Each structure stands twice: as structure tokens, then as C-alpha cells.
């Protein structure tokens, strides 16, 4: 039976919530543990569905993995399987991040083409071309990407687009390559910086992370490490928008506000009061938000993962706004569900024009991906009556204790079997 949420609108969310490790970091860090024989420990891990899925992938490759609350322990053997071509791999997008480590450790990798959120085309072209620049041959065969290399050699690589996934796979493939790799137009996301911090603690020689150019000097061997996962800026941003949309007052801990600089600035423009601290922030809103234009871009631009929240707040704002999606072409399918809730919006290519209204109307809606699901719950909190949110398994993949946290903040929400 698939679960659904019953969400009653009208509550002004108030209180404090702490975010744990980033989904977009922990899965890549787990994969990076493949690079070193021995036991690597990750702390501050989020208790979300994708972590046990990645455990299953690593176990299938020969690792021993234990999950104890927010701590994940990975013991990597001397001899790994290079074949990640089994069902667990197809269930979520991040599984492709084993491609780089397996190619580096085994000289060969077979990785099933991954699944995950239905938010547009996310081809592996840049992953493959990056590995090929390092000396590997790659091909797509029978639903899997295959990489083979007698040895990897450092190279100058320029990405067509600052892809997070391609940056990660090139990093993990090049840390033990012979010589120097210079990666230009690299992704600058905080999760990339977190991966580089972990790799450096394992003995990698990396400079420039957080900038468009990352330089890697290959080393012969990496060693296991202990590492604390960076806080989840997307979950933190979701709580920030929850405060503003419900005209509430929420304090968020466990996240450096600099990672959410632009979203918090956008909330200020919409009329929210924002206070920032060393490891958290507070968002207060006591009136209808003002319409605010957005465009999604790679970090440090506005994150595409918060685009549903930008649509949500503008749906209940004063005025007309334009949201431009520059990263994933299919992310506007979320708008169809917002229309069910009574939003006044229309899609034109990679833009959506929203005319704000005072209140949305309760109905039944369906999640299509992790962030759309969370965005629909926030929108339901701004509707009259009770809204049914279906396919909430998507939300479980990215938001730990979502219902419990909302209830603690004053929302009326329950999980039931549909």
C-alpha cells in the first residue's frame, strides 16, 4: 500500500528544527569510501530512504555496511566487485557515483543506468567524456555504463556545464590517477566541497574546490577516514520557505547560512525578516508575501531543488512573478499539481508566470519527485481544508522525520495508507 499525507491548511508554523546531513552529499561520500581498503565512518547522516539503498549497492560490491541512527560505517575489502549491475542501482540517481571509484580501484566498472526523480534528461555524456580524458574507454551496453582502463592518467578536462555528478565522478576517478588533473568549469556546490574535504582526509591532494577550477595531483593510495556530513541546505531551505508561506516563525539549526545566501535574500525581498547565526538562521513572516522573480542556476545561484518552494510562495503572494528553470527541463510538471490547488499559473517554455492569490484550495495532489512532494505539502498548508498528498515515498527519499517535524512546528498532518 502506498502512503499518503492528509494536510490541513491554516497553521502558522512556529518553533525550531535541526537539519542533518545532506542527501546530496552522504550518498557520494558513501561511494567515495570504495576508494580505500578498511573502515570509513560517516556521522551526521540523514535517516532517509536513499541511505539504505546506497548501502545495498555497496554491499553488492563486496563492502560491509552498518547504519546506526545517523552513523554509517563502511568496511571496504581489498578486492571489490566491479559490477554494479543489479536492481538496487536502478532505484535512484546517485548510484551512478560509484562509477569513478570503481574505475579507479578496479580498472573497470559496470553500472546500471540509474533511476531516481522524473525531473528531466540527465545524461551521462560528461561522466563518460571525463573518464575518457583520464584514459578509460566507456560505452553504454545492455542498460549499463561500462568503463575500462588499464591505468588512469591525469588530464585537463573542461565540462560543458558545471554538472555536480560529472564533477564527482571525475574527482573520485582522478585522485589515484598518474599525474595532475585540472578540472575546469567544475561544479561549485557545497556538497562538492564536502566530498573534497573527505577525499583530502583520506590522503588525496586536491586544491580549488568551491571554485570553477579544481586541481588534483594523483596519489598511489588512499586510507579510510572519519567524516561528518555537511548539513542539508535544501532541507533547511524548505523549512525557510515553510515559515514564509505559512506566515510563521521558524529557527533552523545545523546549517551554515552562507550556503543559502540567495534563497534567504529572496525571502527578504518577499517581506520576511531573516536573522542568520553561525550555524543556523531564523525566518519570520507576518503578512502576505510579495511576488518575487526567480531563476534557477548552479551554485551559487538559486538551487533548482528549491524551485517548487519558489513557485509555492509566489502562488500565495501579492502580485505577479516569473520563475525561470535553467537546470532541469521537466521540473515544471509540479505546476500541474499546483493548478489543482487553485494556483493561477501558466508555463511558457522554461518559464512559469504566477499570479498570486490569497489562499489555495484543498484537493488531492500527486508527488512526482522529492522536492515537488515537499513543495506540495507546503502549498497544502496554505490551502483551506484538508489536502491529500499522494506518492509520498518520494519525500521519504530526501526528508528525515518530515511529518514529525511539521507536527512539532504546529502543522496538522498525518500519514495514512491509501
Curated annotation (Swiss-Prot):
Binding locations of phosphoenolpyruvate: 23-24
Originating organism: Corynebacterium glutamicum (strain ATCC 13032 / DSM 20300 / JCM 1318 / BCRC 11384 / CCUG 27702 / LMG 3730 / NBRC 12168 / NCIMB 10025 / NRRL B-2784 / 534)
Protein name as catalogued: UDP-N-acetylglucosamine 1-carboxyvinyltransferase
Gene Ontology cellular component list: cytoplasm
Function statement: Cell wall formation. Adds enolpyruvyl to UDP-N-acetylglucosamine.
EC number assigned by the record: 2.5.1.7
Catalyses which reaction(s): phosphoenolpyruvate + UDP-N-acetyl-alpha-D-glucosamine = UDP-N-acetyl-3-O-(1-carboxyvinyl)-alpha-D-glucosamine + phosphate
GO BP annotation list: cell division; cell wall organization; peptidoglycan biosynthetic process; regulation of cell shape; UDP-N-acetylgalactosamine biosynthetic process
Pathway as given in its UniProt record: Cell wall biogenesis; peptidoglycan biosynthesis
Gene Ontology MF, one: UDP-N-acetylglucosamine 1-carboxyvinyltransferase activity
Location(s) in or outside the cell: Cytoplasm
Family: Belongs to the EPSP synthase family. MurA subfamily.
Key words of the record: Cell cycle, Cell division, Cell shape, Cell wall biogenesis/degradation, Cytoplasm, Peptidoglycan synthesis, Transferase
Active site positions: 117 (proton donor)
Residues binding UDP-N-acetyl-alpha-D-glucosamine: 93, 305, 327
Amino acid at each position: 500500500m502506498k502512503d499518503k499525507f492528509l494536510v490541513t491548511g491554516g497553521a502558522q508554523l512556529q518553533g525550531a528544527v535541526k537539519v542533518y546531513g545532506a542527501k546530496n552529499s552522504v550518498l557520494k561520500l558513501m561511494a567515495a569510501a570504495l576508494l580505500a581498503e578498511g573502515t570509513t565512518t560517516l556521522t551526521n547522516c540523514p535517516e532517509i530512504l536513499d541511505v539504505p539503498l546506497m548501502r545495498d549497492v555497496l554491499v553488492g560490491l563486496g563492502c560491509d555496511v552498518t547504519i546506526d541512527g545517523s552513523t554509517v560505517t563502511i568496511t571496504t575489502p581489498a578486492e571489490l566487485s566491479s559490477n554494479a549491475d543489479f536492481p538496487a542501482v536502478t532505484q535512484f540517481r546517485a548510484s551512478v557515483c560509484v562509477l569513478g571509484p570503481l574505475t579507479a580501484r578496479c580498472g573497470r566498472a559496470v553500472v546500471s543506468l540509474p533511476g531516481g526523480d522524473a525531473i528531466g534528461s540527465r545524461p551521462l555524456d560528461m561522466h563518460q567524456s571525463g573518464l575518457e580524458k583520464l584514459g578509460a574507454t566507456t560505452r553504454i551496453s545492455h542498460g549499463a555504463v561500462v568503463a575500462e582502463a588499464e591505468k588512469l592518467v591525469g588530464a585537463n578536462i573542461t565540462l560543458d556545464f558545471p554538472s555536480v555528478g560529472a564533477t564527482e565522478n571525475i574527482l573520485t576517478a582522478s585522485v589515484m590517477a598518474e599525474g595532475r588533473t585540472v578540472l575546469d568549469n567544475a561544479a561549485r556546490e557545497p556538497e562538492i566541497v564536502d566530498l573534497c574535504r573527505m577525499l583530502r582526509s583520506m590522503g588525496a591532494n586536491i586544491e580549488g574546490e568551491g571554485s570553477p577550477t579544481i586541481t588534483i595531483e594523483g596519489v598511489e593510495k588512499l586510507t579510510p577516514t572519519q567524516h561528518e556530513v555537511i548539513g542539508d541546505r535544501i532541507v533547511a531551505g524548505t523549512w525557510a520557505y515553510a515559515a514564509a508561506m505559512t506566515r510563521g516563525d521558524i529557527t533552523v539549526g545545523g546549517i551554515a547560512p552562507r550556503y543559502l545566501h540567495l534563497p534567504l535574500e529572496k525571502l527578504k525581498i518577499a517581506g520576511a525578516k531573516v536573522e542568520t547565526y553561525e550555524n543556523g538562521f531564523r525566518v519570520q513572516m507576518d503578512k502576505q508575501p510579495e511576488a518575487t522573480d526567480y531563476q534557477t542556476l548552479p551554485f551559487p545561484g538559486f538551487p533548482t531543488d528549491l524551485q517548487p518552494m519558489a513557485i509555492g510562495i509566489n502562488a500565495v503572494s501579492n502580485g505577479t512573478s516569473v520563475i525561470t528553470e535553467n537546470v532541469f527541463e521537466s521540473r515544471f510538471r509540479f505546476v500541474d499539481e499546483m493548478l489543482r490547488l487553485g494556483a493561477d499559473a501558466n508555463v511558457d517554455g522554461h518559464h512559469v508566470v504566477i499570479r498570486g492569490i490569497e489562499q489555495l484550495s484543498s484537493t488531492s495532489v500527486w508527488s512526482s519527485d522529492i522536492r515537488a512532494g515537499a513543495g506540495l505539502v507546503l502549498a497544502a498548508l496554505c490551502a483551506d481544508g484538508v489536502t491529500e498528498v499522494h506518492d509520498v515515498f518520494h519525500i521519504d527519499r530526501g526528508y528525515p522525520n518530515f511529518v514529525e517535524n511539521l507536527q512539532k512546528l504546529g502543522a496538522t498532518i498525518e500519514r495514512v495508507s491509501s
